[in-house]
């Protein structure tokens, strides 16, 4: 192999075939994790080549979602206009076969969160970026289930105002090789745990890829 083969465009095209399902790790006798290798590869690749705008948008969603939330009413009205979806497909390769998610009002989630009984048993509920912005009903149901079993759900950014934006697992960064940013997100989560004395509190969630 040439000296720079590891960060070549040919290797990029090969790694693009990996969809991150981790079937390789489960099925391979040596437990080779191509998904992890892809993240490591992209980390080095993007030091040499620029990242596509589409990939930048998706990978940085946890930090930049607030921009969409600022114009949520407008976004929700125009998101399914056919011509707009066609433009997004041409510019960013977002398929027109899928509808854009609707940015949801977070008030119903806050209402049920702050109305919880003060159970002695507590768990930290990792409210992932997609659910806390687009599918809050999933989190509402999760809180109800936890309460039925006698647990109070703690959503970090509702519990600690100093956090600013919600905590993130860094999954989108890992998928696009931005391992330094993913590490920074995990450090935020670790700091929250330590600063609030939650070292012995279990962490639960509803998005497996965020927890694993």
Where are these regions (language model features)?
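Iron-sulfur-cluster electron-transfer modules
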Residues: 3-212
């Amino acid at each position: 192999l040439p000296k720079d083969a590891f960060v070549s465009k040919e290797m990029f095209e090969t790694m693009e075939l990996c969809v991150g399902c981790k079937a390789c790790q489960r099925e391979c006798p040596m437990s080779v994790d191509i998904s992890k290798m892809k993240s490591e590869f992209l980390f080095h690749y993007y030091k040499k080549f620029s990242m596509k705008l589409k990939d930048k948008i998706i990978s940085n969603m946890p930090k930049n979602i607030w921009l969409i939330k600022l114009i949520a009413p407008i976004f929700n009205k125009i998101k399914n206009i056919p011509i707009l979806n066609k433009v997004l497909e041409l510019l960013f390769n977002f398929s027109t076969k899928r509808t854009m998610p609707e940015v949801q009002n977070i008030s119903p989630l806050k209402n049920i969160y702050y109305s919880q009984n003060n159970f002695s048993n507590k768990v930290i509920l990792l409210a992932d970026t997609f659910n806390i912005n687009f599918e809050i009903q999933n989190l509402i149901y999760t809180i109800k289930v936890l309460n039925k079993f006698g647990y109070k759900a703690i959503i970090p950014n509702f519990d600690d105002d100093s956090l600013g934006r919600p905590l993130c697992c860094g999954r989108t960064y890992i998928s696009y090789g931005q391992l330094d940013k993913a590490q920074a997100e995990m450090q935020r989560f670790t700091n929250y745990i330590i600063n609030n004395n939650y070292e012995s509190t279990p962490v639960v969630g509803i998005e497996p890829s965020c927890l694993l």
